[in-house]
């Protein structure tokens, strides 16, 4: 089993797809990486030679921030926005949507479950 950036790549998948299991690498970056390292995208992970794995590992480490480093950077950026008090930081702090979505309805995932409001009752039929 090939191991790149701390992730075990699935043996049965094509290399182009398997690389997307690494956080920070999608289909586009996967294709770019394979082109730069001269690895055939249709090769299965189990068929990769040790030399190809080393080339892929070196290329990814040299050119991309992935996995833990990328996660740390994202968290640091969010923390910095919260500290300087910009609009996005305030939205993060209040656990509301950050990218301009509506909140009058929807946004339940970000806001959490509904909370009952004391004193408000539905009008009954007479």
From Swiss-Prot:
Keywords: Ribonucleoprotein, Ribosomal protein, RNA-binding, rRNA-binding, tRNA-binding. One of its GO terms (cellular component) is small ribosomal subunit. It comes from Frankia casuarinae (strain DSM 45818 / CECT 9043 / HFP020203 / CcI3). Residues 95-126 are annotated as: Disordered. GO terms for molecular function: rRNA binding; structural constituent of ribosome; tRNA binding. Located at the top of the head of the 30S subunit, it contacts several helices of the 16S rRNA. In the 70S ribosome it contacts the 23S rRNA (bridge B1a) and protein L5 of the 50S subunit (bridge B1b), connecting the 2 subunits; these bridges are implicated in subunit movement. Contacts the tRNAs in the A and P-sites. InterPro entries: Rbsml_uS13_C (IPR027437), Ribosomal_uS13 (IPR001892), Ribosomal_uS13-like_H2TH (IPR010979), Ribosomal_uS13_bac-type (IPR019980), Ribosomal_uS13_CS (IPR018269). NCBIfam families: uS13_bact. Disulfide bonds: none annotated. It comes from the Bacteria. HAMAP family: Ribosomal_uS13. GO terms for biological process: translation. Belongs to the universal ribosomal protein uS13 family. Part of the 30S ribosomal subunit. Forms a loose heterodimer with protein S19. Forms two bridges to the 50S subunit in the 70S ribosome. Transmembrane segments: none annotated. Pfam families: Ribosomal_S13. This is Small ribosomal subunit protein uS13.
